[in-house]
């Protein structure tokens, strides 16, 4: 009886009178004394099965012992439900199956939690410990089904556009740039280690040098970094690289691909071309390099208005090269007490802010701790700059630009969510362009690559390498959706001398650069084409399209926030024999 004629959730009234064979799990069992009803579930949905002695006494007797999550093989006839028993909440709610035969394929213990999307109070640890049960829930199946549909759509688009799906190594060489590597000891080469790839970056560039011209890969990547809700130690990215393409060409292709994905998976038409915003504009107006444009409450620079005020926090910040910015929380003056605003200040402090100044706009002017520092003229200018009116709450940050932008940007997002300003039905894509090539770490006194060391500077800025590297712009572009970075790309360096200069800016000696990246530098000596690409985070994209709140829900078997697998209990200890084979010994920390 291993053949099946229908999936449970796909039987309609058209099948009334047919004899069908079904397979699935028992979602629910109800004994009404003489009749037994079972909701049979498979990946497509649920159908009601009725065990009636008038149809089959043998089937009814077998159903007496059946419990939730048993796996059944059922044969029966499709019938219309009686009037008054139709279930409008089920796709199969107008029909039922009159069971003629049933075979128990597998029994089941009582699950540790209900197999239902309504089981919201179950802890995530319990769900992850029993992930194979958690994945039976319809919402989890639908999320992974969407992941499949997204990947399928992307593969089809890239195939139609002449891209080749090429795999790159998982065991590769550790790189000094980026996050920490996951290291794999070599048994054959004593004391030496492979690294799991943080991305296929160099290999895809080498494929361009090899002449493949258009490459893609659904690539597994690994980073040993501190985790948060939208990160995992192992993740998947849609990796794309092209030769002889400009930044405009790559962005046009990537956004066309995303429009196709949105139409095929969500039925949403995305107008093209996508909007663009410079990095400087994003940081100035949104306090973020991945702005959420679904709502307003933009950051406004009021430095010129308040620079000569007697409020020293403002005047000193401007005098010392910093800024004063503000956000207008429309209509919020009556909703936030002093205690509430103090709590907002504590939140801003998590992002480096030393405090949060504020005033409330009332009919006769502004009120609040710093209101006395604003005369009528300044109040009028602030009201104009912030489009403020009676009932508004104005929040100010004063410090270095980076601190103010980051703290007010985070506060903007928090308040946008709290006040219901974000339309969750929107999918707002945009490109962030004109990135700085380098970031300067003041504590270490050195430069870091804003994206990665292989990003090509804007051609006009190449002369600044020796004189003003901090002013160089990158040929880089990030794709943002609803305040999340979906991915980033750039035109790559393909000339050996430029790449060597870039390594020098990042603190590599010529010998260190040769030792770490000599094979890439040598490849550039054999005729390298101009090339560039983009990498998009598949897990994050699916999270946003499926309306989930963390990446773990988009991955079949994810890791926890501490990078462990509760199902398999990885990572785990290994035997002394295994360590000896690898020429390793474990040095354990002494517990205090």
UniProtKB/Swiss-Prot annotation:
Residue span of region Aspartate: 201-204
GO biological process: aspartyl-tRNA aminoacylation
Residues with site note (Important for tRNA non-discrimination): 84
Single Gene Ontology MF annotation: aspartate-tRNA ligase activity
Superkingdom, natural source: Bacteria
InterPro entries, A to Z: Aa-tRNA-synt_II, aa-tRNA-synth_II, aa-tRNA-synth_II/BPL/LPL, Asp-tRNA-ligase_1, Asp-tRNA-ligase_1_N, Asp/Asn-tRNA-synth_IIb, AspRS_core, GAD-like_sf
Binding-site list for L-aspartate: 177, 223, 451, 492
Keyword vocabulary terms for this entry: Aminoacyl-tRNA synthetase, ATP-binding, Cytoplasm, Ligase, Nucleotide-binding, Protein biosynthesis
Enzyme Commission code(s) on record: 6.1.1.23
GO cellular component: cytoplasm
Function field: Aspartyl-tRNA synthetase with relaxed tRNA specificity since it is able to aspartylate not only its cognate tRNA(Asp) but also tRNA(Asn). Reaction proceeds in two steps: L-aspartate is first activated by ATP to form Asp-AMP and then transferred to the acceptor end of tRNA(Asp/Asn).
Protein name: Aspartate--tRNA(Asp/Asn) ligase
Organism: Bacillus velezensis (strain DSM 23117 / BGSC 10A6 / LMG 26770 / FZB42) (Bacillus amyloliquefaciens subsp. plantarum)
This protein's encoding gene: aspS
């Amino acid at each position: 009886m291993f053949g099946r004629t229908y999936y449970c959730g796909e039987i309609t009234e058209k099948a009334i009178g047919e004899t069908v064979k079904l397979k699935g799990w028992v979602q629910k069992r109800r004994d009404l004394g003489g009749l037994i009803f079972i909701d049979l579930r498979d990946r497509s949905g649920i159908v009601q099965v009725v065990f009636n002695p008038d149809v089959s006494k043998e089937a009814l007797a077998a159903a007496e012992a059946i419990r939730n999550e048993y796996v059944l093989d059922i044969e029966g006839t499709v019938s219309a439900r009686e009037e008054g028993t139709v279930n409008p909440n089920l796709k199969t709610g107008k029909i039922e199956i009159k069971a003629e035969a049933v075979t128990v394929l597998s029994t089941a213990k009582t699950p540790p939690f209900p197999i239902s999307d309504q089981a919201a109070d179950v802890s995530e640890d319990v769900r992850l410990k029993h992930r194979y049960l958690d994945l039976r829930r319809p919402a989890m199946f639908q999320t992974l089904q969407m992941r499949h549909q997204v990947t399928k759509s992307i593969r089809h688009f890239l195939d139609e556009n002449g891209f080749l799906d090429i795999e790159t190594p998982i065991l590769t060489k550790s790189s000094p740039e980026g996050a920490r590597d996951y290291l794999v000891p070599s048994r054959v080469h004593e004391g030496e280690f492979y690294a799991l790839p943080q991305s296929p970056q160099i290999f895809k560039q080498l494929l361009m040098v090899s002449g493949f011209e258009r490459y893609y890969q659904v690539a597994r990547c690994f980073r040993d970094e501190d985790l948060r809700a939208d990160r995992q130690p192992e993740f998947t990215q849609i990796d794309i690289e092209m030769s002889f393409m400009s930044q405009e060409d790559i962005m046009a292709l990537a956004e066309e691909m995303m429009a196709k994905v949105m139409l095929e998976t969500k039925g949403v038409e995305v107008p093209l071309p996508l909007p663009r915003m410079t990095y400087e504009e994003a940081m100035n107006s949104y306090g973020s390099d991945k702005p959420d444009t679904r709502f307003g409450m933009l950051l406004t620079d009021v430095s010129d208005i308040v620079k000569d005020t007697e409020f020293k926090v403002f005047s000193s910040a401007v005098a010392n090269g910093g800024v004063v910015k503000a956000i207008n929380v429309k209509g919020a003056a009556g909703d936030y007490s002093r205690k509430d605003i103090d709590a907002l200040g504590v939140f801003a402090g998590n992002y480096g802010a030393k405090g949060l100044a504020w005033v409330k706009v009332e009919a006769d002017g502004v009120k609040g701790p710093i209101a006395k520092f604003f005369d009528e003229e300044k109040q009028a200018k602030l009201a104009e700059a912030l489009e403020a009116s009676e009932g508004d709450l104005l929040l100010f940050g004063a410090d270095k630009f980076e601190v103010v932008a980051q703290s007010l940007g985070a506060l903007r997002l928090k308040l946008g969510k709290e006040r219901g300003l974000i339309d969750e039905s929107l999918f707002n894509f945009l490109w962030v362009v004109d990135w700085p090539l380098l970031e300067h770490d003041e504590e270490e006194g050195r430069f870091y690559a804003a994206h990665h060391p292989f990003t090509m500077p804007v051609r006009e800025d190449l002369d600044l390498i020796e004189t003003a590297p901090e002013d160089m712009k990158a040929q880089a572009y990030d794709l943002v959706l609803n305040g999340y970075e979906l991915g980033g790309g750039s035109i790559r360096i393909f000339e050996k001398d430029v790449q060597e200069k870039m390594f020098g800016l990042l603190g590599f000696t010529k010998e260190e650069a040769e030792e770490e990246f000599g094979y890439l530098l040598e490849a550039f000596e054999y005729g390298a084409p101009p090339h560039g690409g983009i990498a998009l985070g598949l897990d994050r994209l699916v999270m946003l399209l499926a309306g989930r709140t963390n990446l773990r829900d988009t991955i079949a078997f994810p890791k926890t926030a501490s990078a462990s697998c509760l199902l398999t209990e990885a990572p785990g200890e290994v035997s002394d024999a295994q360590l000896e084979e690898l020429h390793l010994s474990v040095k354990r920390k002494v517990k205090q």
